[in-house]
Amino acid sequence: MSRNLIRGVLSIAGANVVVMLLAFPLTPVLVRTLGSAQYGEYAFMLSFLGVAWVFVNGGVFDGVRKYIAEDRADEHWQNYVFGFYFRIAILFVVPSSIVVALAAYSGVVSSILGTQFTTFFYLVGLLLIARQLRAVGRSVLMGLGNEHLSEPLLIAEKFVFWPIAIGLAAAGVGVAGVLIGHIAAAFLTAVAAFVLLSRSLSLSSVFHRAPSDFPRRTLLGFNNQTIVLMFLLNSLLYTDILLLQPIAGSDQAGYYQAALVVAEFLWVVPIAAQTVLLHTSSELWSSDQQERITTMSATVTRYVFLVTMLLSVGIAVLADSFVPLYYGPDFEASITPLRLLLVGVVGYSVARPILAIGQGKGALRALIYATSGAVALNLLLNIILIPLYGMRGAAVATSIGYGSMLVFHVWCARRIGFEPLSDLRVGRILAAALVTTIVIYPLDAAIASSLLSLLVVPPIGLVVYVGTAIAVGALDHDDIDDLYERTPDRVVKLFS
């Protein structure tokens, strides 16, 4: 089964860019409608959902993509994997949703967080079911190499979510209205995904047991270790908000969440690469193409570093212009945490494709050890720094925790058997970033209008960065030719 890595990355990254462009004008509308306090409550619920999702999904999203992509002799293999994982998904999500609802019904939630959170937790119980169904549908499509089908569903989902969320929030429903928007959008996306799947697989597979020689224990073992790994990864992502909200209050949590949203713009390409590389590298590991894996990992890691450094320089320089214009003057407090987060976000960005290749081999034990080191460091620093410095302390702690992921996972990759930094060209990329900063920082300072600065500086910065990257050898002509040859024809025609 051949795959086009570039097509997969472009499909996922392209969908994420469209989702971000859609969210770009609508997020500040939602933030201003909710206010900083309610937005902080919403951020807390998203963080809770992120941590709970680890146990609810049970490793299904990664497991489906890894195993359904493998080229097995059994012609019914894909149907067996789909049916097996669908049943596992239902087995995980239904009891989990009941537990969340019982926590709200019993008064535990209101006694700890406040009465307004009771309704939020009831809605999250429904949202977990909707997201689980959507995750199964999308992961099967992706595992089959149909990212060009799975990713437009994300765009459609946001077209459903935003009108409902903003409309209900403006009508006075608040955070509950936003959660209702998530539920409706996720359910509709799930239905569309299964309609698309019906063209490639037999949906009746969910009712039929796989044969006795089906490797259930292997798949379950992968899932169990994936749950641990995903819990650690989500702990890294949400520890700051989960600690900041009760310690420093909803206002600071809201400002900090705004900084996180902007910083995570850097993850569009890294997440796309991470998503595609899991099932792509799984094929290569299964056919013992270790040399090709090392070459692929080194190239992808360099491209990810190149792109994220460009974005980080732009965000760091333009933060003063962008944040108040985007979120409103009240959110100027988000600027410093945003800049503090950027270094760590770049490090985690580079670590993402390395992590995915390790998952593709199934070497989860080593990945768990590596991630545990970063999580422990992140937790310790957040516990120490948040009580002392509030959201700035959270930003410093989280940035160090994110950055340590690169150190730990490079060590892990070498133990697994591939070298992701063999072609990183770190000095050349940093030189391109430095030259770009020297050009655009005074340019931004010289432009009085924030809006004009946001229109003028980015394209100039892009030209300077790419030109410098080529001049110093961070990006060479062979790279450009290779990218051109592997880019889908319709994308080439779009820019020709």
List where the protein language model places each region.
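Interfacial segments at transmembrane-helix termini and the short loops linking adjacent helices
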Residues: 106-124, 315-349
